[in-house]
Amino acid sequence: MYLFKAKKVQLLLVGCICAASSFAVNADSTFQDSKHIDPFLGLEFSSSVSSGYGFDDNVLHQRNSHIISSDYYTLKPTFSVFGQRNTKNFGLYYLGNYRHYNNNVVKSDSYDDHQLNGVFNWELGIRHHLELTGSYSKNHEALGTGVTQGFFFDSDTSLKNIATFNAFNISHDIGRTDKKVDAKYTYGAKGAKGNIIVDLSQAHTNYDILNSYQSAFKNYLENENVTENDARIVFRHQYTDRTRFDYTLMYKDFNYINSERDNNELIGAFSVFSQVTGKSKLEATVSKVQKKMQSTHFSGVNWDVSYKWQPVDYSTIILKTSSEAKESDNTGDFVQSFQNGITWKHQFLGHITSLLSYKHTSNKYHIRKRTDRYDDLALSLHYLFRPKIEFVFDYQYTLFHTDNSTDPVFIDGNSYGRQLGYEQNQFGLSVKVAI
């Protein structure tokens, strides 16, 4: 009799725990920003700050004996303001990213990035909508990536035509400024069966050219600055309440200081967005690209497909595959990039969220024989201690390997051998607080 009662108590406890867990999972388990209302203008302000400590085992993205590791401190403040008046609303958003390396060898690679975004929406009438957006970012490219991919440190000055940081007087990360403005006009009532969208944008990328750089590297950086002008028109067809089709015609124009690198693209795309079932969603875009460069032309088919499956409220799986033709490098070669990835997001105990993702990227060069492969693995755990206090642990692993590890870079008419490929592990622990 006692054993029977004990089993009943155990079953009751298990049932209570399951019910509590189910209730907790369905509760709001996401970080909540603090919102403050200005009593005079009615503006809404919110801000937060994240501070953390981490470790990077390959700060300069190097191979073998050139690897340097360091622990670091991070600080990421955010600030936003939102306002609305009649049929107009606007938002202004700031994001900062500060990282300080403690290893004296790479302390000069500490950085502070800043990003400012603005948006203005104006409902001109039932069928006329205008959206203006702009962004400005002052950021960096870590050594061993971007324009210095495959560069390395070597004190042997007798070696010629090799891409070393020493030879070009590069002592820390490469500064970069990105600016973009966009104007989008939409014709058609919200929720209508059809809409026409006209979108015009311009983007600038400019590298910081320091006087300390060697003259050839200065010219190299200057020729990497680019202005991109985009124009697109989209016909949006809401086929059913669960399915939408987009038909897009787009023109892109890329301008460099060296006019021989100028090129343009004409793109026709078809997109489908469908809530397939109550637990799954499909987004797919297939496009035909015609690229015209000064010395050659090519055409290809790009795609971007993602499938989201949410079997239960607290667990989501996303599958993604894509292919795109990247902007050509300074040799006139162009790259076809293929990506495949999977992401799993899971919430448990009502206030803990895990995010696990893997992505494989394959970049194939069309003129010279070279294929680059990237494997990226990321894991993060978010513990919501309070609605406005969150602890985060994150880990990132990157493996970059290529079948042509000495493929040269061309700088000011000369070729310089590189050491391509690296392996990197990063992990950190941070706390985020709403202010």
Give residue ranges: language-model regions.
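Transmembrane beta-barrel strands of outer-membrane/channel proteins
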Residues: V49-F55, L92-H100, L132-K138, V147, ...
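Surface-exposed strand-loop-strand hairpins of Gram-negative outer-membrane beta-barrel proteins
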Residues: G52-T74
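Outer-membrane beta-barrel translocator domains and adjoining extracellular loop/strand segments
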Residues: N58-H66, N102-Y111, A142-F151, Y207-N219, ...
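Hydrophobic, lipid-facing positions within transmembrane beta-strands of outer-membrane proteins
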Residues: Y73-F79, H114-G118, T177-A183, T227-I233, ...
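Residue-level signature of outer-membrane beta-barrel architecture
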Residues: F79-R85, F120-W122, A183-A189, F235-H237, ...
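Repeated loop/turn-to-beta-strand initiation elements of outer-membrane beta-barrel proteins
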Residues: T87-F90, I126-L130, G191-V198, N206, ...
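Outer-membrane beta-barrel "beta-signal"
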Residues: Y383, I389-E390, Y395, Q419-I435
